[in-house]
């Protein structure tokens, strides 16, 4: 079942997610529906806020990515197909001390057709729980690190446009304002 992805200017995108405490069938079902929604939208990550649920849950799947990245999960390097798709709850990110910050173009399913360069640390460690509540430590870099940082920002009410340099944000500002107007108009037509 595909869920509706909320677009920019929906207030839920600015809400910090509540910590997940119940690792039950309802959580597994929500994660499954989020994965289906993300895949249908041709995305590589999706946060719960993007489907209107302000909780600390996101999903990531980079199996089809054509950009290199490295990972180590709980001290091992399992094949990518064994760790993807990832269901991440209650994440905490620590950028590596010696990592570089790179400016790379990002998009977002809540900002259709809007893209811009975003500075992010290249390598991170993320501590999280999976859908069963099992704790994990993931060290990663490249696209995987960028994707997780983008989704975890959503979980904290931070959007990729907030991280852009002023020049980049100014270049897309008209498109962002247009999207905000469309979202407001749609909310008036279909109040929750």
From Swiss-Prot:
Gene Ontology biological process: co-translational protein modification; translation
Q: Which family does it belong to?
A: Belongs to the polypeptide deformylase family.
Q: What is this protein called?
A: Peptide deformylase
Is Repeat one of the keywords UniProt gives this record? Answer: no
Sequence positions that bind Fe cation: 108, 150, 154
Q: What does this protein do?
A: Removes the formyl group from the N-terminal Met of newly synthesized proteins. Requires at least a dipeptide for an efficient rate of reaction. N-terminal L-methionine is a prerequisite for activity but the enzyme has broad specificity at other positions.
What is this enzyme's catalytic activity, as reactions?
A: N-terminal N-formyl-L-methionyl-[peptide] + H2O = N-terminal L-methionyl-[peptide] + formate
């Amino acid at each position: 079942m595909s869920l509706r992805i909320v677009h920019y200017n929906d207030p839920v995108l600015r809400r910090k997610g509540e910590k997940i405490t119940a690792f039950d069938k309802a959580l597994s079902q929500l994660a499954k529906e989020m994965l289906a929604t993300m895949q249908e939208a041709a995305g590589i990550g999706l946060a719960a806020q993007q489907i209107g649920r302000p909780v600390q849950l996101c999903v990531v799947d980079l199996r089809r990515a054509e950009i290199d990245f490295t990972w180590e999960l709980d001290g091992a390097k399992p094949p990518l197909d064994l760790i993807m798709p990832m269901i991440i709850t209650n994440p905490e990110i620590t950028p590596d001390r010696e990592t570089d910050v790179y400016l790379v173009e990002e998009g977002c399913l809540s900002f259709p057709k809007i893209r811009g360069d975003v500075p992010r640390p290249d390598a991170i460690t993320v501590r999280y729980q999976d859908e069963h509540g099992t704790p994990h430590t993931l060290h990663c870099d490249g696209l995987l690190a960028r994707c997780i940082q983008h989704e975890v920002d959503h979980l904290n009410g931070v959007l990729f446009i907030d991280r852009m340099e002023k020049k980049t944000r100014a270049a897309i500002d008209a498109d962002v304002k247009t999207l905000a107007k469309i979202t407001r108009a749609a909310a008036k037509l279909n109040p929750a």
